[in-house]
């Protein structure tokens, strides 16, 4: 008979290569805090429902708290262990501490609803942190919007000079984009904040569990009523990865502009020494590594989103082992976006904007062409005729190497 917790019907031990291939402890150990929180509320529920005694509940609860402290203190290694995942790891530690009483922890529970709970608690915690960091970025952009309301710069389409805009309007555009991202994150939170615990493997439990009490105790808005749905979907993971990809896309576009602006050709932005790097060969270099890395990291977040979508696309109800593949991409997505959001705000605050040069560039060239066109329209000229006329003037001004205003005044 195998020594696995599920090994009652098995006559052979699990092949060591299968055990290694099957294991997720090396990466899902980050869920230990959420796993213990869920287990402590679960065991309280078992006592409340008279399935365990109060003394049994207290013994399990206290031992779990000891395990939490020991893990935080670094007393355990998560590599080269026999336990398959963080859930079994904690349960085995519990049994080592309090004997057979520890074997009662899993009463009325499956790892299917347990891991679904842990993931919801984890993504909720990290989602709140992402929201907080996003709010800081939006506030920073609001400050830059106010500071640069009157500072003119060239606006671009197709990366060609188009019309004058305020530098403050530029920052406000990104403030609006990240504001919508925050709204998406808020909407995600409302949808995901429901408890799967009590769904069991897929069909609930015959024990008199109080799912609503557990949900309330863990800070959820309610329960996921359909037990099949509760354990079988990872749409909340996909949606968070999707929102993260959207945020990273906006960060990448912002960083692309700042990278261009920091070149000698633009010279709109001066990088702070504390947020730039040099070259191992060229002593003249001052490199924008921070925005380049943020721009680059958007690719890995996109990749994780496509990976989890692909994992989930062909799975029959309910739980399948494929769903173990949801975690590494999710964890890396969360770590990546947190790191980028923690970096972008102080980076923006460190920049010096060459507003005098921006204004000069905005007032040179032919950025006033659209305003002149519309002034002709206001005098009664048909739009297409006005467009053609201003285009002809621009061609003449280019030939004479003068501005549009100089040409018109001279005429």
Curated annotation (Swiss-Prot):
Keyword DNA repair part of the UniProt annotation: no
Keywords: Amino-acid biosynthesis, Arginine biosynthesis, Cytoplasm, Lyase
InterPro entries referenced in this protein's UniProt entry, alphabetically: Arg_succ_lyase_C, Argininosuccinate_lyase, Fumarase/histidase_N, Fumarate_lyase_CS, Fumarate_lyase_fam, Fumarate_lyase_N, L-Aspartase-like
Reaction catalysed by this enzyme: 2-(N(omega)-L-arginino)succinate = fumarate + L-arginine
Highest taxon of the lineage: Bacteria
UniProt cross-references to CDD domains, sorted A to Z: Argininosuccinate_lyase (cd01359)
PROSITE patterns on file: FUMARATE_LYASES (PS00163)
Family, as annotated: Belongs to the lyase 1 family. Argininosuccinate lyase subfamily.
Annotated protein name in UniProt: Argininosuccinate lyase
EC number(s) reported in the record: 4.3.2.1
Location(s), subcellular: Cytoplasm
Pathway in which this enzyme or protein is active: Amino-acid biosynthesis; L-arginine biosynthesis; L-arginine from L-ornithine and carbamoyl phosphate: step 3/3
Keyword Lyase set for record: yes
One Gene Ontology biological process: L-arginine biosynthetic process
An annotated GO cellular component: cytosol
One annotated GO molecular function: argininosuccinate lyase activity
